[in-house]
Amino acid sequence: MDNKNFQSKTGFNLENTYLTLPNIFFSEQNPKGSKNPKLIKFNTSLAEELGLNEEVLNSDFGLNIFAGNETFPGIVPIAQAYAGHQFGHFTMLGDGRALLLGEHVTKDSKRYDVQLKGSGRTIYSRGGDGKAALAPMLREYIISEGMHGLGIPTTRSLAVVNTGEEVLRERFEQGAILTRIASSHIRVGTFAYAAQWGTLEDLKSLADYTIKRHFPNIAKSENKYILFLEEVINRQAELIVKWQSVGFIHGVMNTDNMVISGETIDYGPCAFMDTYDTNTVFSSIDYAGRYAYGNQPNMALWNLARFSEALLPLLNPNLDEAVNIAKKSISNFSKLYKKYWFNKMRAKLGLFTEKENDELLIEGLLSTMQKYEADFTNTFVSLTLNKFEDEKVFSSDEFKTWYALWQNRLKEENRSQEEVRNLMMNNNPYIIPRNHLVEKALKNAEKGDFTFMDNLLEALKNPYSYSKDLEKYTKLPEKSDTPYVTYCGT
């Protein structure tokens, strides 16, 4: 089947412009394939958004694509090369178990990578087997869809296939392949790789390609590389604020896990915070709390500093001048983050305007929440509904004092109760992908029962809907002596 007939049958409008880059950025390779695959999850709503033929792809025809048994006609699959600072240590990486099948271009000219994850060893696999386990792939599916529902830029999951094979981790697990959709997979680590092992022309080619793909409005600007740096800084500031506002903890913010597009990527040891504590860490390998909830803005800044270092030769031929430009641009991150953060927190508290003491009001609430170990999500739900139950924080003197200050501040807005509540409901999710719910979904799914997972996914499509039907997903996990721990399974 040629590309034209394939497009007509599936809806996939395929290209691979990444192949126009110098060949140090990729390695051509076909997926290994699966002997006895089964399509266990297909994202019909995403397929519809992308203009794909759901009926064809949610069949044996689609299964063969998602299982790595068939590739897109006329398109060469590639593994992408990149580096990364892993917990601060620079190393060569690359797609060790993923392949970019191609790029799908929608009818409104939006371009998306179509990537198989868990499709076998590549030239960049090092000691890995190139495979993926079922539970981590389903975990990425659930949480990425949850993030999308929350309105947070993210990669998406189109399909999950059970390969019919076992993979050895700490124990034997069911093998799987996830089909990931992303605006692109160009990472901070891709630029670090180009700066370290490529030529100046390689670096320039990558930057020009990325600008054309993600920031076409600056492509013809005289100072396009400086503007490029500033655009990426701005997108990351916006993204991290959105993470913080819902208690999302990525867990492994290495430079290979920060993409230039500003999407959330790689849902390995991520989790959502229940009890508000800025020191919260879930990852089993984050012993020092480098990627703790409260440190995520600092780590984003650190990653962006590495990005600016990679761009230095493009910012100015004179190194000293280039460093000064980079420093000036990077210094804006904290200002942008602070601005976006307090704007978001005002919205979460029903405030439409900016007043001098708002920062003290916001910080006063958060410090009280931390002191009394309040649930992050449900505290803001309680404030939204003006309904205070089951939390010791609400009976504290600190909260009562804060509440009076907040009410006085709301009066200054001259807005109706309905307007205030609508603003709060649109910024305070009623539900999130709570860790215990995700774990229950995965446990059942591994046994072949997808009922709870499907119901959870349906609920997460509308997390800002304060519906009675969603109330069961607001319940906190039972108290446990064992802390919740996540692993880098994805």
Swiss-Prot record:
The keyword Kinase does not apply. Mg(2+) binds at residues 257, 266. InterPro entries: SelO. Its cofactor is Mg(2+); Mn(2+). ATP binds at residues 94, 96-97, 117, 129-130, 180, 187, 266. Keywords: ATP-binding, Magnesium, Manganese, Metal-binding, Nucleotide-binding, Nucleotidyltransferase, Transferase. This is Protein nucleotidyltransferase YdiU. It comes from Clostridium perfringens (strain ATCC 13124 / DSM 756 / JCM 1290 / NCIMB 6125 / NCTC 8237 / Type A). The lineage of its organism: Bacteria, Bacillati, Bacillota, Clostridia, Eubacteriales.
